Amino acid sequence: MTIASHRLFALFLCTLLLAGSAQTAPAITDPVKAGYDLAVRMDQVDTSQDSYSEAVMSINRGGKVLTRSFKTYSKHFGKDGKDEYSLIVFDRPADVNGTKYLVWSYRGLEQDDDMWVYLPAESLVRRISGSSKFASFMRSDLSNEDIQNLDDVDEYDYLLQGEENVDGIDCYVLERTPKKGKETQYSRQVQWVRKDTLLRLRADYYDKKNRLVKKLFFSRQEKIDGIWTVTQMRVERPREGSFTVIDWSNLRYDVGLSDAYFEHSALQR
């Protein structure tokens, strides 16, 4: 998921500051290159070919809580294995049982990502494109854009702003802005990347008017099949006063998923 998913993260390792030390971090001589290098290493953390997970999504709005559960299947494809399929299948509550989202994410700006949703009540497959990518994902604080798993390094410009300690955790502070031609609702994102697990700890998203519209917190992280993985995410929209929490479980890598899972025709099976 762009947003929606546990596979969005990766790797950059520098010498860690000693706990309690008064040592000062070295100056960043080229923050643009350092930011890009960080993004490249982050992109390399997930070495799996495919994955499976189960999740519960709790949507909190106006004092009411709406809960949904789903399963996610993901697989890399393409000649270099850098593109990605994702299939999200909802099973609870009953009114969304059988709803499916299928995403084909491509590296680079040359080809737009493909996204469809299957609505069982209507026996209908709808293509999600244009402004509908910015609409809410299943009434949550995530958008359809956010659930696209793949974030191509070369679709953004980067700036390593420095280092910061967040709740006792040492982080790199990385800003990224979309390159011309990338279809997105966000003007920039600021990410706090943990030095120990090298996953994002937090991310702030800004709209085209440079207003803070979304805050993401990656509060629980676990090593699964040798890969550091986010297993809980909280998404807040400060202006709306709402938030969504996703808890992942039973996550497995390299399970041998067939391409047949991700065929367009499979949505109505």
Predicted regions and their residues:
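Bacterial N-terminal signal peptides that target proteins for export
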Residues: M1-F12
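Bacterial N-terminal signal peptides
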Residues: A10-G20
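Bacterial Sec-dependent signal peptides at the C-terminal "C-region" and cleavage site
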Residues: A19-D30
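N-terminal mature ectodomain segment of secretory-pathway/periplasmic proteins
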Residues: D30-A121
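A short, amphipathic edge element
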Residues: K33-G35, T67, Q148-L160, N210-K215
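Hydrophobic/aromatic beta-strand elements that line small-molecule binding cavities or substrate pockets
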Residues: A39-V40, S69-H76, K100-S105, G162, ...
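Short, ordered beta-strand-loop transition motifs
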Residues: F77-E84, G162-D170, I224-D225
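Gly/Pro-enriched, hydrophobic low-complexity segments
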Residues: D91, D114-Y118, L124-S129, A135-D151, ...
